[in-house]
């Protein structure tokens, strides 16, 4: 149930209120830089159609075009946007440079940070709250499965096709600080240098075993960046010395989510790896611990260049890396980046970058409305009320903490019984006659 219809500060639809968050100058500058020229279907109209497709999870070109045609008057009020036609929309996705959507995303991110500094502020919780003065980044990638018969440009392995989204996520605000969309044929470590170019001295990087490349780790250490990566079993290490570990109390052993087993100082054993990791005298720290994952305790080993933090801190930092996996799961559940409305590379990139933009706008709405429930539920409410004329922030605030919108729907007048469409009551016509 939704709140009763009362006077609000706006007569705009929820859909228009969300779109109005994007300043027109950002779209104009991005279109100019990418040299997108058009006579009728403007870059703003193109971006608006893709945002609607993401926000409502529409699965086809016809779905977007039919919705725009059904609400043609409302669509035109959004800064004079043109209603998309199927062929025009498809050609724009195929031919226009998706760099425009990427520029709009990053500049919109900067705009929201200036508009509401608390939106992008660092908010570490729990064990990581001790790192208030350090930025913690999680590096990972997510594979987007495609069909080889349709997406032949994205051939992955022998009989598969896939695209890949590389992400450097700031764990303080759970927002991306770097992203690349490309075909999945490249290994994750190929984009590691570019994805971490914005890290500063004193920052912390956590990554999985795909990024355990000693040449890459050496470059991070030389820049003063602390890293925590998972050890690969095929990498041979030579133990130099063992460090003492704290033993948990008997009563807390079963409740602990991290239990340290070993803490050792190691060197790369193979000549090739030792040559690649020449910084810090080739000395590394290897922490082995049992970490809770999906309700089970798994033994994992981590490599780091920090010799001062406790072994439990190293393990807890790696546990924080799962925040980027939560981000990918959240993105795929709320935005349309599994079923694509175009087959070529440009169309896929347009849709992925627009999905990231819509996800960021929804995150902003969650922040300003102080939403207390799951993110997928917020996306569902916004999707269901896209054409409702309500203040979108007041609508989300009305759900409160109990999960039910304050104020119910009350029946004002019932003139006659209501029947299902195309059905009549039993006694509506003469009995025993055809027709």
Model feature map: region roles:
Residues 77-96:
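Major-groove recognition helix of helix-turn-helix-like DNA-binding domains
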Residues 154:
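A glycine- and small-aliphatic-rich helix-loop capping segment at beta-alpha/alpha-beta transitions
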Residues 1-67, 94-96, 103-107, 111, ...:
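Single, function-defining residue in the core of a domain
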Residues 69-79:
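Extended, structured, electrostatic nucleic-acid-contact surfaces
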């Amino acid at each position: 149930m939704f709140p009763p219809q009362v006077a609000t500060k706006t007569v705009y639809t929820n859909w228009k209120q969300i779109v109005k968050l994007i300043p027109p100058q950002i779209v104009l500058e991005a279109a100019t830089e990418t040299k997108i020229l058009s006579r009728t279907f403007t870059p703003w109209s193109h971006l608006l159609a893709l945002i609607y497709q993401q926000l409502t999870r529409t699965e086809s070109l016809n779905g977007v075009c039919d919705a725009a045609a059904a609400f043609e008057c409302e669509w035109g009020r959004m800064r004079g946007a043109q209603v998309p036609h199927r062929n025009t929309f498809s050609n724009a996705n195929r031919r226009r440079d998706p760099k425009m959507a990427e520029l709009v995303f990053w500049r919109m991110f900067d705009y929201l940070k200036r508009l509401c500094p608390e939106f992008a502020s660092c908010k570490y919780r729990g064990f990581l709250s001790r790192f208030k003065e350090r930025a913690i980044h999680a590096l990972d990638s997510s594979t987007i499965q495609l069909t080889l018969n349709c997406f032949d440009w994205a051939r992955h392995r022998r009989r598969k096709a896939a695209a890949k989204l590389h992400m450097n996520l700031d764990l303080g605000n759970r927002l991306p600080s770097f992203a690349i969309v490309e075909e999945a044929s490249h290994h994750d470590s190929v984009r590691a240098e570019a994805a971490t170019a914005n890290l500063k001295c004193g920052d912390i990087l956590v990554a999985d075993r795909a990024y355990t490349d000693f040449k890459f780790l050496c470059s991070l250490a030389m820049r003063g960046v602390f890293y925590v990566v998972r050890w690969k079993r095929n990498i041979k290490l030579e133990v130099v010395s063992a460090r003492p570990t704290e033993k948990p109390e008997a009563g807390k052993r079963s409740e602990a989510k991290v239990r340290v087993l070993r803490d050792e100082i190691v060197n790369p054993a193979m000549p090739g790896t030792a040559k690649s990791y020449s910084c810090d005298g080739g000395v590394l720290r290897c922490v082995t611990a049992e970490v809770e994952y999906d309700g089970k305790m798994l033994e994992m080993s981590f490599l780091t260049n920090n010799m001062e933090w406790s072994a439990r801190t190293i393990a807890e930092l790696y546990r924080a890396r799962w925040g980027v996996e939560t981000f990918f799961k959240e993105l795929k559940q709320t935005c349309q980046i599994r079923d694509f409305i175009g087959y070529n590379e440009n169309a896929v990139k347009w849709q992925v970058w627009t999905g990231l933009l819509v996800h960021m706008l929804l995150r902003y709405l969650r922040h300003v409305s102080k939403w207390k429930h799951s993110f997928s539920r917020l996306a569902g409410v916004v999707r269901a009320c896209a054409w409702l004329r309500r203040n979108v922030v007041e609508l989300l605030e009305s759900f409160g903490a109990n999960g039910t919108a304050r104020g119910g729907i009350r029946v004002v007048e019932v003139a006659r019984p209501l029947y299902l469409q195309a059905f009549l009551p039993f006694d509506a016509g003469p009995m025993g006659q055809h027709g």
